[in-house]
Design a protein with these regions (language model features):
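Beta1-alpha1 glycine-rich phosphate/pyrophosphate-binding loop at the start
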Residues: 1-70, 96-103, 113, 150-196, ...
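FAD-site-proximal beta/loop scaffold in flavoenzymes
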Residues: 104-138, 223-297
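Hydrophobic, well-ordered secondary-structure elements that form the walls
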Residues: 186, 247, 307
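Short glycine-/acidic-enriched loop or helix-start segments at secondary-structure transitions
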Residues: 10, 73-74, 97-99, 120, ...
Length: 334
């Protein structure tokens, strides 16, 4: 499930082991987050296309526009279409929002939507291609968040001609989850960093367009469950910043579609699929899961490792099915 790095790594190993492999992708273009989430300046699309074409030549079958859980269910794949095993690697791509007033205004995006539009609609080739979204050109852009996705979004906005591009983060720079080099590159390119601030309301005009964001300054209290000190609002510190584009990079969670349409598939309290840490087997026989849909947001390297681990487990599972069939045939003959 899903043509992301986790499933591509799994597919590559399984096809080499001699199995027939089909990969289902919900979108119209293959590659998952490698294509629609990571900007062109960090990972050129031609590299991903090359790797996918290598898998095609080796016999992997790719199907696009297949939304598992809607177009087809897991049970239909196994019971009706005859697949012996299923590997779920759909990632954790459901964006989190701030749940503050004004998020409906034109010009307010989730980082997922913003980067997907930029990548799949080739806006990164601006000005050769028109921007297929509320224009960043000559506008003030604010990105809320401090992770790698926030850095991708703010640097993309600059490449789309933004007049200014700023990171607004509720803790200090030291607590930012983004890699140090990503922060360094953003600063080198002219991104402004505003820390210990938190948006509390988006403001707009009578036409429904974003015009500003109201923020409050923060102090740091006791550490929370992440080990970082919790931001605490400072009374009377409200201020308003003009902006016409705001991008929310506040993290992601698991899309519940597959979990809700697959009876017998165990999930965690946070909605991720529960899988054995060593084998990646789920509570449903023949169904395996790995990557962000199990662990939550992680790195590309960990995702690839999960795919290769799943391939080994699936291979062992399929060999056990073959042994059971041979044993049944032997008993029948006797």
């Amino acid at each position: 499930m899903a043509a992301v790095l986790t499933s591509l790594a799994c597919a590559g190993d399984l096809i080499q082991m001699g199995h027939q492999v089909h990969v289902c992708e919900a979108l119209h273009e293959l590659g998952g987050v490698l294509v629609y989430g990571i900007p062109e300046f960090r990972l050129p699309k031609e590299i991903v296309d090359h790797e996918i074409n290598v898998l095609r030549r080796r016999g992997v079958v790719f199907e696009t526009n297949v939304v598992v859980g809607k177009t087809v269910t897991i049970d239909e794949l196994t019971d009706e279409q005859g697949f012996d095993a299923v590997f779920i690697a759909t990632g954790a791509g459901l964006p989190r929002f701030l749940n503050i007033p004004g998020e409906h205004f034109n010009g307010v995006y989730s980082a997922n939507e913003f980067l997907t539009r930029v990548n799949l609609m080739r806006a990164y080739r601006f000005p050769e291609f028109d921007e297929p979204l509320y224009p960043c050109k000559d506008r003030d852009v604010i990105v809320v968040g401090g992770g790698n996705t926030a850095m991708d979004a703010v640097r993309s906005a600059l490449r789309l001609g933004a007049k200014s591009a700023s990171i607004y983060y509720r803790r200090t720079e030291k607590e930012m989850p983004a890699r140090v080099e990503e922060v360094h590159h953003a600063k080198d390119e002219g991104v402004h960093f505003e820390t210990l601030v938190n948006p509390v309301e988006f403001l707009g005009d009578e036409k429904g367009n974003l015009t500003a964001v109201k923020c409050v300054r923060q102090g740091l209290g006791e550490p929370d469950e992440s080990g970082r000190r919790s931001p605490v609002p400072i009374k009377g510190s409200d201020f308003v910043v003009p902006c016409q584009v705001a991008i929310i990079a506040a993290g992601t969670s698991a899309n519940p579609l597959i979990q809700s349409t697959t009876p017998g598939l165990a999930v965690t309290k946070r909605g991720y699929i529960s899988a054995n840490e060593d084998t990646l087997a789920t509570s449903k026989p023949g169904v395996f899961a790995g990557g962000d849909i199990v662990t939550g947001g992680a790195t590309v390297i960990l995702a690839m490792g999960a795919g290769r681990k799943a391939a080994k487990s699936i291979n062992e599972y399929l060999k056990s099915l073959d042994s059971a069939v041979k044993e049944a045939e032997r008993v029948a003959v006797n």
